[in-house]
Each structure stands twice: as C-alpha cells, then as structure tokens.
C-alpha cells in the first residue's frame, strides 16, 4: 500500500493561505501471497511454491511478469542462489481453470511472463525448485525466498516472501565389504559394514537402527566389533549358527551427524558424512 498526501490553498486579496495536509492510502489493486507445500527442505527433494494473485479492481490486469529470486543471498561478496527451478513444473490457473503453460525463464532469477488476472478474479501459479550446491544443509538454516509481480498496469510491483527451514534428520547409507575375496573352508572371513550419515542430525538409539544379514557360507566362532569396541552376543547382536542369520539389536548402532563446510572460493556447500563401522569376523564352516 502507498501513502499519499494532499494540500489545498486559498487565495484572496493577494494573500495565499494553505490548508491542512490530508493523508490517504492507495490500496493495491493486486495482492500476492506465496506459500510452500512443505515448510522444510532437504538436498534431495524439490519444494513446491504456490503464488496466489487477487485482483480487487474493476479492470483486468494483463501483461504481468512474476520474478522469483530463488532464495538469492549474499556470501563473501557474491550473490549465491540456493534453489534451481525444476524445468517443466510451472502450472498456471485463472479463477481455478488451468491455462496453457506460461513462458518461463529458469534464471536465476526465475521469470514467468504473460500473466493475466481478470477483474475481481484470481490467478494461481505453481512451480517447483530444487535445493542445489549453494543451499545450506546444517541444522537450523533457512532459505528466504521472494517473489514479485510487475507490469505496466501496476503503479508498483507487489511482492511476497516465504521462508523454508532445512529438515532435521539423519540420512543414512550402508556399504558392505568382504575380506579376503577368496577363502577356503576353515579360513577366516571378515565382513565390514560402513554406515554413513549425510544428514544434519545424528542417528541415535531412538532411531532403532539395526543391520541384518544372512552369512553364506555360514560362519562359526563369530567376533563382532562396533567402532573398534568389542560387542557381546545377545546384548548387542544375535546370530544363528545353523542358518547364518545375523542381526544387531535395534538401537545399538548410532551414527554421528555430518559436518558441512562452505568453499570460500566458490560458495558451494559440501558434506563430510558421519561414519560408524560394524565388523564381523568368523571361520568359514
């Protein structure tokens, strides 16, 4: 909304007398809101944004352009853009009716042109953006995203903001290694399970992590360690020497959170995973 002031003058007998100053407010004909379907983001999932435009005026607004800064922020004297438009995801509705796909320039900034909002009506835009290498992922970080709409029919651009917060969660993967690759009956075999966490939150006992496997060939005389510390059967793991079925007790495995660093030269973020290692050694039956 824009404020305006106005003052009159009364002139008589060569004298000018000013009136008081009145102040008013010019209501915007077009209003905008911006929302995200999910208020949290991760490195692997796109964010769907919803833009709603409402025209309270008596005339249609045509030739409008939406500009989205995709969360651009300053870092180290440079502008970094943490979101990338997902090609082909833009959808455009007028009074709830689907329209032809609008003209989109991915940017950054993202621009969508040729928009119209009927008199007394509304238009809705939906599109997706994916966090990229400039999106911070450590716990507590946010992306502030601004969209604005401009056009010849508008005295001023209208804009709306939306903030999304990085999701706090562990993100786990497991790798299995065998040593040696060739073994004879009666020889020793070692399985090493490496569990990595690229998430910003440690995997604690509350997550009830468990590793299960069926060893073939079956192993006897098992020794098990976790991060170098010896484990005890029943307390930490179970093993059926007849079937080869092995399982850790749920909650015994924990994995620290990843650490994140931002490259001073490029502004890109990288993650160093938190790592835990489970080692199982036995004799081939």
Where are these regions (language model features)?
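Exported/extracytosolic protein signature
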Residues: 1-285
């Amino acid at each position: 909304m824009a404020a305006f002031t106005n003052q009159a003058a009364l002139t008589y007998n060569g004298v000018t007398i000013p009136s008081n100053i009145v102040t008013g407010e010019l209501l915007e004909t077009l209003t905008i809101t911006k929302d995200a379907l999910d208020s949290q983001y991760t490195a692997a999932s796109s964010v769907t944004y919803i833009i709603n435009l409402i025209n309270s005026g008596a005339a249609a607004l045509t030739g409008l352009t939406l500009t989205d800064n995709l969360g651009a922020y300053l870092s180290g004297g440079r502008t970094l853009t943490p979101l990338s438009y997902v090609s082909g995801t833009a959808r455009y509705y007028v009074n709830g009716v689907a329209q032809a796909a609008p003209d989109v320039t991915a940017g950054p900034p993202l621009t969508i042109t040729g928009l119209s909002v009927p008199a007394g009506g509304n238009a809705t835009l939906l599109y997706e953006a994916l966090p990229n290498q400039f999106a911070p992922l450590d716990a507590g970080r946010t992306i502030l995203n601004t969209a604005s709409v401009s056009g010849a029919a508008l005295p001023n651009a209208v804009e709306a903001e939306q903030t999304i917060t990085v999701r706090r969660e562990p993100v786990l993967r497991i790798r299995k290694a065998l040593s040696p690759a060739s073994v004879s009956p009666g020889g020793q075999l070692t399985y090493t399970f490496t569990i990595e966490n690229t998430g910003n939150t440690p995997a604690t006992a509350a997550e009830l992590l468990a590793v299960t496997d069926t060893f073939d060939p079956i192993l006897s005389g098992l020794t098990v360690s976790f991060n170098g510390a010896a484990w005890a059967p029943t307390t930490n793991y179970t093993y059926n020497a007849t079937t080869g079925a092995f399982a850790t007790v749920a909650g015994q495995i924990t994995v620290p959170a990843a650490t994140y660093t931002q490259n001073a030269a490029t502004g890109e973020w990288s993650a160093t995973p938190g790592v835990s290692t489970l080692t199982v050694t036995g004799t081939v039956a």
